[in-house]
């Protein structure tokens, strides 16, 4: 056949590259096409690099002045670590996924995957004790500890593994399959990043190229053993929920699974800031995302489940690095200088580095600005993709460590490291009990921890309080103490923590939440909206208040939560709230609001096209006006659009409607003019 050069490519390889500069030059040259060649260079660099021992790897790394790197744990203590987390005692739990073979192979053949508990008993910054909690569950990819046991993501299941007597050995006969259906097609895009949210739900991520249908298992479900094949089919109790890229959550008491947001690529790493705003880091596509419940986000490939999304929410990052970020963690502790407070830490696989970004509030959301190249491994076989912040305020990064950095093959099965990044002079206060078992503290102390400078302690304390409330063992006066904190504390972040703690312990009535909708703090109002809608059935009193707030609330953050709430109520209940939201012309250029409002309005259009077109005529958000008209045409309701066009006032309004009308007609043939078209 004919061979033709369609674009020039110049490959320059000298063993060491300035990854960020090369990426920017390459994108300018190619118009952002062909950047995959950089992945090839990075993979080649890894395969050709000299293997470094953990000690040599530490010496080879560079870090910001005033900080140090040390190996907290490494082979042979751990191998093939795929996930890690903390427990109430400040011990680190590590999932060794020794069943991983390649992106397309591996499930249970190795048979020796383990869940380890690592401890630094003398607090010298190095793990010195290793306990095997569980062995033989195939393909462990995500872990979280809380509420009496281990929550383990191991496709196809989300398992609860209890340890009722606290002997650090799994009660294997009592393991529960809470969810099933997680896919495994692309083994480095599986269920990952389990993380307790402020609202008592367990959050996680799922990759784009591993389609899954997730739901409650039929009867008790099936727990897989070494040597067994991944199932061709799983059976559900009821229907499953589709997810093929996104953020999800599961409530351990209500036993309910939800997709929080659809899209992305291979999101790995999720965390929330002091206001409870969630962020993820992602691979391949831009790296940083503000996650809003109900959001539909840019996808690396494929189509959205809903064909009427029309446009999706884009990254908040205003810059690019080499692709493949993971492990997002917002620094909310006291060991680092104030400069790092609220910054988001991420590992970067292709840059072999830990990077920080600044989360700058903007409208209803954020702009992610590059802060620092905090730590560079200078080691082409360093594969960091998960991070944690510990009880002492230090930052930890998990290094899968392999000569194949993209997971196509496992070339070094017996390696794995966890590095600690710490200030040479920690600013953390070493108060009495800082490293004690949080689960052994009384409720008074757990409430006090909600004002801690260490978010680690506030969060662990909240999970413990939640567990006590579930068992009916919450001490008398605990809710009263939290209410006092909420009402009297001058720190807005501490008030939010008190609100969350009240919620997870059952201390918030609807009447109290309705009252909080008038709070002076926008984030208190916003979170009260979300909590009132948690069960998808806000009361008539809440709906009336929401409609008023949609018109009158001055905060774009509150309006964002109202837009998100639209998807958690019936179609009939959405109209008044939507009418208030579309009246804010100041939101027309907002990064999130017009699209999120549209996602809530979209199913209303085919349900009542005439009323929807009235909403379009009243809307002061051009995107919403355009999309309502387009959706009406897609629903075959040309007459409704034609009639609205005839009544529309102003050239801009007519132009917005016509754009939607034209887009809806695109590709159609033999379209008959609607009856009113001549008059219009």
Question: Positions of the model-derived regions?
Answer:
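Short intrinsically disordered, low-complexity coil segments enriched in acidic
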Residues: 1-6, 44, 96, 210, ...
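Short Pro-Gly-centered flexible turn/kink motifs
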Residues: 1-12, 328
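Terminal connector regions
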Residues: 14-41
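Surface-exposed helix-capping loop/turn segments at secondary-structure junctions
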Residues: 15-23, 255, 335-337, 471-476
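Beta-propeller domains with acidic blade repeats across secreted/periplasmic ectodomains
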Residues: 40-448, 456, 464-466, 509
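Long, ordered, helix-rich scaffold segments
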Residues: 398, 414, 421-680
């Amino acid at each position: 056949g004919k061979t033709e050069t369609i674009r020039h490519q110049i490959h320059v390889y000298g063993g060491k590259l300035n990854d960020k500069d090369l990426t920017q030059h390459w994108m300018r040259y190619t118009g952002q096409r062909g950047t995959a060649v950089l992945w090839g260079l990075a993979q080649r660099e890894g395969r050709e690099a000299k293997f470094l021992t953990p000690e040599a790897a530490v010496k080879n790394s560079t870090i910001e002045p005033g900080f140090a790197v040390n190996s907290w744990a490494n082979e042979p203590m751990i191998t093939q670590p795929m996930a890690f987390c903390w427990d109430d005692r400040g011990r680190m739990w590590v999932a060794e996924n020794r069943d991983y073979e390649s992106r397309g192979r591996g499930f249970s053949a190795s048979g020796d995957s383990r869940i380890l508990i690592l401890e630094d008993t003398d607090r010298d910054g190095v793990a010195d004790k290793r306990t095997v909690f569980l062995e033989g569950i195939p393909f462990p990819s995500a872990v979280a500890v809380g509420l009496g046991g281990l929550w383990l993501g191991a496709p196809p299941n989300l398992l609860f593994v209890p340890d009722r007597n606290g002997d650090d050995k799994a009660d294997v006969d009592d393991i529960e399959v809470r969810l099933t259906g997680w896919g495994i097609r692309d083994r480095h895009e599986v269920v990952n990043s389990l993380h307790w949210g402020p609202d008592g739900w367990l959050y996680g991520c799922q990759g784009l190229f591993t389609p899954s249908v997730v739901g409650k298992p039929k009867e008790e479900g099936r727990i897989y053993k070494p040597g067994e094949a991944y199932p061709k089919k799983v059976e559900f109790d009821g229907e499953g929920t589709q997810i093929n890229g996104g953020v999800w959550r599961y409530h351990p008491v209500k036993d309910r699974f939800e997709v929080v947001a659809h899209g992305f690529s291979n999101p790995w790493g999720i965390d929330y800031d002091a206001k409870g705003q969630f962020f993820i880091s992602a691979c391949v596509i831009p790296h940083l995302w503000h996650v809003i419940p109900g959001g539909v986000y840019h996808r690396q490939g494929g189509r959205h489940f809903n064909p009427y999304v029309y446009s999706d929410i884009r990254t908040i990052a205003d810059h690019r690095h080499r692709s493949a970020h993971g492990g997002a963690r917002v620094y909310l502790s006291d060991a680092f200088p104030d400069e790092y407070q609220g910054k988001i830490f991420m590992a970067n696989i292709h840059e072999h580095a830990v990077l920080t970004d600044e989360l700058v509030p903007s409208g209803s959301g954020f702009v992610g600005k590059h802060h620092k190249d905090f730590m560079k491994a200078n080691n082409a076989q360093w594969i960091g993709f998960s991070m944690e912040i510990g009880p002492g305020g230090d930052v930890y990064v998990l290094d899968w460590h392999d000569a194949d950095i993209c997971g196509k093959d496992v070339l070094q099965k017996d390696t794995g490291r966890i590095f600690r990044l710490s200030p040479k002079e920690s600013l953390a206060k070493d108060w009495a009990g800082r490293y004690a078992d949080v689960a052994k503290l009384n409720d008074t102390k757990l409430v006090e921890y909600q004002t801690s400078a260490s978010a680690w302690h506030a969060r662990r304390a909240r999970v413990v309080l939640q567990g006590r409330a579930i068992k009916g063992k919450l001490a008398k006066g605990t809710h009263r103490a939290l209410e006092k904190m909420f009402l009297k504390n001058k720190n807005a972040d501490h008030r939010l923590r008190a609100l969350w703690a009240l919620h997870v312990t059952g201390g918030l009535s609807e009447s109290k939440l309705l009252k909080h909708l008038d709070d002076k703090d926008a984030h208190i109002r916003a979170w009260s909206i979300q909590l009132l809608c948690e069960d998808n059935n806000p009361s008539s009193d809440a709906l009336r208040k929401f409609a008023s707030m949609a018109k009158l609330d001055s905060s774009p953050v509150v309006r964002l939560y109202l837009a998100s709430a639209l998807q958690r109520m019936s179609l009939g209940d959405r109209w008044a709230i939507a009418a208030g939201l579309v009246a804010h012309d100041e939101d027309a250029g907002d990064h999130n609001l017009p699209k999120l409002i549209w996602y809530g309005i979209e199913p209303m259009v085919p349900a009542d096209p005439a009323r929807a077109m009235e909403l379009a005529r009243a809307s002061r958000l051009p995107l919403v006006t355009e999309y309502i008209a387009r959706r009406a045409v897609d629903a075959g309701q040309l007459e409704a659009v034609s009639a609205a066009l005839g009544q529309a006032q102003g050239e801009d309004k007519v132009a917005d409607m016509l754009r939607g009308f034209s887009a809806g007609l695109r590709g159609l043939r033999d379209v008959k003019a609607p009856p009113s078209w001549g008059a219009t």
